[in-house]
């Protein structure tokens, strides 16, 4: 099991919309993530900077970051693009984070 972490940026004032959309995560997206080895996925927010910190436990390679060509993922990106910083293809601007400590 591999642990992955990355950060994204939420637009100012969009915390509630972000939370509401994720509270109603599409079942087909959730299943896609599970089918591609994502067993745990958490996202935290630093409200001072609107930085989102995501953490995933994955088996296999890459987790959600390898699903960029999937139509369900692309539709989710389009759905989320108005409330967060995105690339030209509407994928979230995502910066991988290096693990510097782990305790089991």
Curated annotation (Swiss-Prot):
Keyword vocabulary terms for this entry: Carbohydrate metabolism, Cytoplasm, Isomerase, Rhamnose metabolism
Pathway per the UniProt entry: Carbohydrate metabolism; L-rhamnose metabolism
Keyword Isomerase in record: yes
Catalytic reactions on record: alpha-L-rhamnose = beta-L-rhamnose
InterPro entries for the chain: Dimeric_a/b-barrel, L-rhamnose_mutarotase, Rham/fucose_mutarotase
SUPFAM superfamilies, alphabetized: Dimeric alpha+beta barrel
Location of the protein in the cell: Cytoplasm
Binding site for substrate: 18, 41, 76-77
Pfam families on file: rhaM (PF05336)
Entry's Gene Ontology cellular component terms: cytoplasm
Catalytic class of the enzyme: isomerase
E.C. number: 5.1.3.32
Catalytic residues, chain numbering: 22 (proton donor)
Keyword Acetylation: no
GO MF term set: L-rhamnose mutarotase activity
GO biological process: rhamnose catabolic process
Protein family membership: Belongs to the rhamnose mutarotase family.
Function: L-rhamnose mutarotase involved in ulvan degradation. Ulvan is the main polysaccharide component of the Ulvales (green seaweed) cell wall. It is composed of disaccharide building blocks comprising 3-sulfated rhamnose (Rha3S) linked to D-glucuronic acid (GlcA), L-iduronic acid (IduA), or D-xylose (Xyl). L-rhamnose mutarotase catalyzes the anomeric conversion of alpha- to beta-L-rhamnose.
PANTHER family per UniProt: L-RHAMNOSE MUTAROTASE
NCBIfam families, alphabetized: YiiL_rotase
Oligomeric form and interacting partners: Homodimer.
Protein known as: L-rhamnose mutarotase
Source organism of the structure: Formosa agariphila (strain DSM 15362 / KCTC 12365 / LMG 23005 / KMM 3901 / M-2Alg 35-1)
